[in-house]
């Protein structure tokens, strides 16, 4: 491990947030190494660029490992960084140039090359905010009358991951509700009005559920363990009974044990999307939606 921070210098003609996020994502893959991100934003003139490159040079001459990541619209500015880094023997990553060149080639047009041009609010920004608020307001089936407004409806035992998954699906732009299923208690009658293809059951390994519930009970000072809430034998029975309810509902069941939130979300979206097609309809796609395949 390096004795001093390894420096990633971000040079940008705007905020530099795009490059910073990429640098942070890459940095997360190196545990135990101290990577320091140095930002040089709003670089619009040659003197400003010279000042930024001097800071890079000083760090390099001090014996630190340094690399430069930049998002610059103007070709001359990109060339200035590239030439300086080559002269200093420093690794340099141009995030903007190759993208602009590819788009110019594909469109047959020249880029406007206007620094600091506002990119505007994402087309799906307000959709995502609204969907996340919807998930929070309708957590644990709080407002049964609104179940039919959801794009996706999650059903399962308490602490099977329904709430965080609902909010994450909301972040992706899908209005999601979650309904707790409890043995001996009938699901809300409003659930019958929800399209079958929208409903997904969640389950989880009994031992894992015991660990999660045990932490919650300890956090409450031992309260909340009534009716075997954190008892393994009772949990096995609960999962079995809730599984029967889920099968009566005719919904697919996804085991969330060991799955990252993103993986669970992808599985839910895939299964709902496929069931919607089978039903002769389709799951609403949020504007600008995207998701990573596991």
Curated annotation (Swiss-Prot):
Where along this sequence does the record place binding of ADP? 156-163
What does the UniProt keyword field contain? Kinase, Nucleotide-binding, Serine/threonine-protein kinase, Transferase
Catalytically driven reaction(s): N(tele)-phospho-L-histidyl/L-threonyl-[pyruvate, phosphate dikinase] + ADP = N(tele)-phospho-L-histidyl/O-phospho-L-threonyl-[pyruvate, phosphate dikinase] + AMP + H(+); N(tele)-phospho-L-histidyl/O-phospho-L-threonyl-[pyruvate, phosphate dikinase] + phosphate + H(+) = N(tele)-phospho-L-histidyl/L-threonyl-[pyruvate, phosphate dikinase] + diphosphate
Annotated GO MF terms: ADP binding; ATP binding; phosphotransferase activity, phosphate group as acceptor; protein serine/threonine kinase activity
Kindly give the Pfam families that the UniProt entry links to this protein: Kinase-PPPase
Report the enzyme's class at the first EC level: transferase
Q: Record's superkingdom?
A: Bacteria
Question: EC number(s)?
Answer: 2.7.11.32, 2.7.4.27
Q: What's this protein's function?
A: Bifunctional serine/threonine kinase and phosphorylase involved in the regulation of the pyruvate, phosphate dikinase (PPDK) by catalyzing its phosphorylation/dephosphorylation.
Q: Which family does it belong to?
A: Belongs to the pyruvate, phosphate/water dikinase regulatory protein family. PDRP subfamily.
Name the record gives this protein: Putative pyruvate, phosphate dikinase regulatory protein
Task: State the organism of origin.
Answer: Cutibacterium acnes (strain DSM 16379 / KPA171202)
């Amino acid at each position: 491990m390096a004795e001093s921070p390894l420096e990633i210098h971000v040079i940008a003609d705007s905020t530099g947030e795009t490059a910073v996020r990429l640098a942070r994502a890459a940095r997360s893959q190196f545990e135990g190494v101290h990577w320091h991100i140095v930002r040089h934003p709003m670089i619009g003139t040659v003197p400003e660029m010279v000042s930024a490159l001097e800071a890079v040079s000083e760090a390099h001459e001090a014996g630190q490992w340094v690399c430069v990541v930049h998002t610059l619209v103007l070709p001359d500015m990109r060339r200035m960084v590239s030439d300086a880094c080559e002269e200093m023997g420093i690794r340099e990553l141009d995030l903007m140039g190759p993208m602009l060149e590819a788009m110019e080639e594909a469109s047959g047009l020249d880029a406007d090359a206007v620094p600091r041009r506002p990119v505007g609010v994402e087309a799906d920004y307000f959709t995502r905010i609204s969907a996340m608020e919807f998930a929070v307001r309708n957590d644990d089936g709080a407002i049964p009358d609104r179940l039919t407004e959801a794009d996706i409806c999650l059903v399962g035992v308490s602490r099977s991951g329904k709430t965080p998954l609902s909010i994450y699906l909301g972040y992706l732009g899908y209005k999601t509700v979650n309904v707790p299923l409890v043995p001996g208690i009938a699901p809300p009658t409003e659930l019958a009005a929800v399209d079958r293809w929208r409903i997904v059951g969640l389950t989880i390994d009994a031992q894992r559920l015991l660990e999660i519930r045990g932490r919650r009970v300890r956090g409450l000072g031992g309260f909340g363990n009534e009716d075997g809430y954190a008892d393994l034998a009772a949990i096995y029975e609960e999962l079995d009974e809730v599984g029967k309810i889920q099968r009566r509902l005719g919904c697919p069941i996804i085991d969330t044990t060991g799955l990252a939130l993103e993986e669970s979300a992808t599985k839910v979206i895939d299964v709902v999307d496929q069931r919607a097609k089978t039903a002769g309809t389709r799951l609403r796609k949020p504007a600008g939606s995207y998701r990573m395949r596991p």
